[in-house]
């Protein structure tokens, strides 16, 4: 525990070990050895296992686990009971939420819910990483349902009067929708 505490902000540190030999009360030899001590990241990663998420636009989908590609925002919620912790003297610093290539982060909290909003989500995979002061991470992933969506594109619009003089007008649009 003391070694972890001395490396609260790094996975590596230097040490010096001095070995002194005595004959009675008289020092007869001294040897100093220097080295590097390493924290194994996988053994010192934050303890984190749960979060909740909710996608916007339930008015269209009827279900907060359905994500409309490029339209929905995803709000990640980490309840106090599910907050990340450390058993190796590192401080939990932040959470990073990712939905495909869209990411957002928020600081860790000891006693409050943490909310992270990821705008313009374009994936059904929602991941949250708990990051400690050494930079070690534990990632938890949940799956939502991705609803593909492409906004309409109008490539041309033409108008034409019937018989070139009537008040009725024909409107033609071309594109993808």
PLM feature spans:
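Solvent-exposed strand-loop boundary residues in beta-sheet-rich modules
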Residues: 23-25, 37, 84, 99-103, ...
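Short beta-strand segments within Ig-like beta-sandwich modules, predominantly Fibronectin type-III
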Residues: 102-111
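Short, compositionally biased P/S/T/A/G/V-rich stretches that sit at domain boundaries
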Residues: 38-70, 146-168
């Amino acid at each position: 525990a003391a070694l972890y505490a001395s490396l609260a902000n790094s996975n590596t540190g230097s040490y010096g070990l001095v070995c002194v030999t005595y004959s009675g009360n008289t020092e007869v030899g001294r040897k100093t050895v220097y080295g590097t001590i390493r924290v194994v990241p996988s053994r010192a990663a934050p303890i984190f296992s749960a979060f909740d998420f909710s996608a916007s636009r339930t008015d269209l989908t009827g279900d907060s686990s359905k994500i409309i590609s490029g339209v929905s925002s995803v709000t990640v919620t980490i309840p106090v009971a599910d907050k990340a912790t450390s058993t190796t003297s590192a401080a939990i610093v932040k959470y990073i939420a990712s939905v495909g290539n869209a990411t957002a982060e928020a600081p860790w909290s000891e006693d409050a819910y943490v909310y992270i909003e990821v705008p313009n989500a374009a994936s059904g995979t929602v991941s949250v990483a708990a990051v400690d002061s050494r930079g070690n991470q534990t990632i938890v992933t949940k799956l939502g349902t991705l609803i593909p969506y492409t906004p309409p594109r109008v490539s041309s619009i033409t108008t034409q009067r019937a018989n070139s003089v009537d008040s009725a007008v024909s409107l033609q649009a071309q594109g993808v929708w």
